[in-house]
Amino acid sequence: MSVPTVLEKILARKAEEVAERSARVSLAELETLARAADAPRGFARALQDQVKLKQPAVIAEIKKASPSKGVIRENFVPADIAKSYEKGGATCLSVLTDVDYFQGADAYLQQARAACKLPVIRKDFMIDPYQIVEARALGADCVLLIVAALDDARMAELAAVAKGVGLDVLVEVHDGDELERALKTLDTPLVGVNNRNLHTFEVNLETTLDLLPRIPRERLVITESGILNRADVELMEISDVYSFLVGEAFMRAESPGSELQRLFFPERGVPVSGSTLD
């Protein structure tokens, strides 16, 4: 019997979590909460508007820990981090809500979104329509669908549920086969290429560059994971990739927003402030 990969372990636990949550709060109750939530802020539109200007469209991630690195940030106050990112020039936020493997929480998404005006994606392992409705009830503006975690029928079902509750969808791929499935199954404009292999957790920026020629121009490519310095940013920009999802590089910095500005908008200079998070 083969040893389960990290992704397989996460998905097995996620199925248990969905069962536990749906036993506590019914889908009908969640749908009522979703209808009462603040109007979506337009996640895809915000990225598209920035990319049209050939300016970095940064999805800045709020992430306390990961399976490969353990705790990444000890001083973890989502509202403060969100404000710092907004000031530093982020276009959108990504908030980890997975509890068991990333030490995330639903409340972190709510706190971050309430602290700023940026659109927010719920970063989690979505496998069930329940989680999609739950995301909207929490106030999310977008959800992540990971092709490696879903078959085509479920992927299409989750995207349809997302559309029904007013959520944008970011579909994430890791290789050519997944890209082909995503393009065939979903019409979302947002295609994320994760440079981290979710089975081994190794990172290679060439993943984005290799897949780029196969992605139609009308889709917006978001490069995810492994962007650590200006050279990485410039490598993507000369290839016409202007949208980035970055977490760890910011989370390890004393001031996440200042690090965002240093990495993506160096011409603005780095803000000077007494606060470690401003």
Curated annotation (Swiss-Prot):
Named in its record, the pathway it takes part in is: Amino-acid biosynthesis; L-tryptophan biosynthesis; L-tryptophan from chorismate: step 4/5
Q: What does the record give as EC number?
A: 4.1.1.48
Please give the family membership noted in the entry. Belongs to the TrpC family.
Which Pfam families is this protein grouped with? IGPS (PF00218)
- Catalytic activity reported: 1-(2-carboxyphenylamino)-1-deoxy-D-ribulose 5-phosphate + H(+) = (1S,2R)-1-C-(indol-3-yl)glycerol 3-phosphate + CO2 + H2O
Superkingdom field: Bacteria
Spell out the SUPFAM superfamilies in the cross-references.
Ribulose-phoshate binding barrel (SSF51366)
Protein's recorded name: Indole-3-glycerol phosphate synthase
The broad enzyme category this protein falls into is: lyase
Q: What's an example of a GO molecular-function annotation for this chain?
A: indole-3-glycerol-phosphate synthase activity
Single biological process term from Gene Ontology: L-tryptophan biosynthetic process
Q: Which InterPro entries match?
A: Aldolase_TIM, Indole-3-glycerol_P_synth, Indole-3-glycerol_P_synth_dom, Indole-3-GlycerolPSynthase_CS, RibuloseP-bd_barrel
Task: List keywords of the entry alphabetically.
Answer: Amino-acid biosynthesis, Aromatic amino acid biosynthesis, Decarboxylase, Lyase, Tryptophan biosynthesis
